[in-house]
Structure formats: C-alpha cells, structure tokens
Amino acid sequence: VNNLFFLNKPIYHHLLHEDFTSSSLSMYKKPEKLFGYRKALKEADNFLESYYGKNNLRDELGHAYTVYTIIQLIRLCGQLTKYNYERIYSFIENFIDNSAVKTNLKFYQPAKGDSKIIPILIKLKLIKFLIYFCNYKATQRYNKK
C-alpha cells in the first residue's frame, strides 16, 4: 500500500426506511432531490482520480450509480397518481436521456434479486413501462403488511 487514509467520521450513512415516503415528503414535486447520489459518486471518482490517476473503481462507481438510480426510480414511481403522472414522466424522460445514466448502465452487474428489467427499460427508453414497472416494484417493496 502506497497511501492509506483514515477518516475519523462517517462519510456516508444509509438508512433503509420501511416506506418510500420517509426519504422525502412529496418527492415527485422535486424529484431531483432524490438523485443527489450522482454528485456524491462524481466527487468520490474525482477524489480517487486525484490520488491515483485513473482509478480502478470506475466499474464499481458505475454499478453503484445504476443501483441507486434503480432504487430512487422505484421510490419516485411509488408515489405515482393520476395528478403527478405527467411531472414524473417528464422528469424520467429527461433523466434517462442523461449521458451519465447511459454510461453507467454498462457497469451494472445485477446480483441475485437485483433488477434486470429496469435497466433494459431505461436503455430502450420505454418510459411508460418503466414508470409502471417501478410503481409495481414499489408496491411490492413498501406495501407489505
């Protein structure tokens, strides 16, 4: 090991809530707030590159980007109603057209239980199917009683 870093405080804390609304109230009003991980992962990439040059974690960062994208799309679509459908549709349409989304999809390596369908729907830009499938997944995940 040439360099070693010790951080005396957590740099990231992830808490899995029991329902999708707990991460933010009315997420559909400002859905971009759900996707703040994009900046965090970019900063991690920049940090690693500044110390190691082109880092070997590009695949892992791309995979993480896609995993968090899937999680947040499911949370967002879990709040789908006839009143917010157009806003969610418009956001997702613009979001999946982003070059970072397209680039990072190729690094996604789903483990057992991870979504294989959502990345395909993103690649094919099948927005309606993506919205309804994510809504279905949110119902499965968060409406267990």
Where in the sequence are the language-model features?
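C-terminal, non-catalytic tails of nucleotide-sugar-dependent glycosyltransferases
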Residues: 35-59, 102
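Alpha-helical elements of Rossmann-like donor-binding domains used by nucleotide-donor carbohydrate transfer enzymes
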Residues: 39, 43, 68, 87-91
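Membrane-interface aromatic/basic loop that binds lipid-linked glycans or pyrophosphate carriers
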Residues: 77-145
